[in-house]
């Protein structure tokens, strides 16, 4: 008696190819049609886990964490130097949704860099900025500019401590003229001191002290005069806004 066997069902060839094309786990190297290439881990056909991406257009290299196809977690971005061709670190820190977010260090030049908080690719929160001219700003940031309480220490040792808005001195603050041994305390509007008081401060230790000390203020109520002037400037500023 003949024995009949059911023929085995085979999947279409296109489906087999599609399964082989699905990317999961570690892949040695995957090239995109635009020339970019990626080496690292995948999940459900997208970059996920540890990996390195190289962009052909600008030569940038990112090494670090990925999540759902985007830079997410800790990673380092490097860019080629236009003159030497050697790679230089541009940013090391945390990412979220393909943008700098959390603590990180951004290098703007050989002697200029920022270390601190980021949000949506912008400096936001607390941070310290080292400028190429030797100045250092340390304090609060918002929308990629100093905003809130902060201190700017100049190369010569003089410093400003006080309020900032839109990247410049705005509001109450103190400026220490340590080279001349004086301290100015007052109110700033758009980086210009509008009113305040100047006193001697560390004049004996100053490298270039003023010729004569500042005489004692004879106003009966200097604090009251300053408060009145501040109120006037604040009112004028509010009306202008």
Swiss-Prot record:
Pfam families: MORN (PF02493)
Gene3D superfamilies, alphabetized: Histone H3 K4-specific methyltransferase SET7/9 N-terminal domain
Ranges for region Interaction with TP53: 206-240
Keyword Repeat: yes
Region (Interaction with MDM2): 6-35
InterPro entries with a match to the protein in the record: MORN (IPR003409), MORN3 (IPR052472)
Keywords: Cytoplasmic vesicle, Repeat
Region Interaction with SIRT1: start-end pairs: 76-100
Superkingdom assignment: Eukaryota
GO CC terms: acrosomal vesicle
Subcellular location(s) of the protein: Cytoplasmic vesicle, Secretory vesicle, Acrosome
Chain positions of MORN repeats: 38-60, 62-84, 91-113, 114-136, 137-159, 160-182, 184-205
Function text: Assembles a suppression complex (suppresome) by tethering SIRT1 and MDM2 to regulate composite modifications of p53/TP53. Confers both deacetylation-mediated functional inactivation, by SIRT1, and ubiquitination-dependent degradation, by MDM2, of p53/TP53, promoting a proliferative and cell survival behaviors. May play a role in the regulation of spermatogenesis.
Assembly notes: Interacts with MEIG1. Interacts with TP53, MDM2 and SIRT1; the interactions mediate post-transcriptional modifications of TP53 by MDM2 and SIRT1.
Name this protein carries in UniProt: MORN repeat-containing protein 3
Protein source organism: Bos taurus (Bovine)
Lineage of the organism: Eukaryota, Metazoa, Chordata, Craniata, Vertebrata
């Amino acid at each position: 008696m003949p024995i009949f066997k059911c023929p085995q069902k085979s999947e279409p060839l296109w489906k087999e190819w599609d399964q082989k094309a699905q990317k999961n786990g570690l892949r040695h190297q995957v090239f995109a049609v635009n020339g970019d290439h990626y080496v690292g881990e995948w999940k459900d056909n997208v970059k996920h886990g540890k990996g390195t991406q190289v962009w052909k257009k600008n030569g940038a290299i990112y090494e670090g964490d990925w999540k759902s196809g985007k830079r997410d977690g800790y990673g380092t971005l490097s860019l080629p130097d236009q003159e030497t061709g050697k790679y230089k670190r541009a940013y090391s820190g945390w990412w979220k949704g393909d943008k700098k977010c959390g603590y990180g260090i951004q290098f703007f030049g050989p002697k200029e860099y920022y270390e601190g908080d980021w949000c949506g690719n912008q400096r936001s929160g607390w941070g310290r900025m080292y400028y190429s001219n030797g100045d250092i700003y340390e304090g609060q940031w918002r929308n990629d500019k100093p905003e809130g309480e902060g201190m700017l220490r100049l190369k010569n040792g003089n410093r400003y401590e006080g309020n900032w808005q839109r990247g410049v001195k705005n509001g109450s603050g103190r400026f220490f003229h340590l080279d001349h041994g004086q301290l100015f305390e007052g109110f700033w509007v758009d980086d210009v001191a509008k009113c305040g008081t100047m006193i001697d401060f560390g004049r004996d230790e100053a490298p270039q002290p003023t010729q004569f000390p500042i005489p004692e203020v004879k106003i009966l109520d200097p604090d009251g005069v300053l408060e009145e002037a501040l109120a006037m400037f604040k009112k004028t500023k509010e009306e202008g806004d």
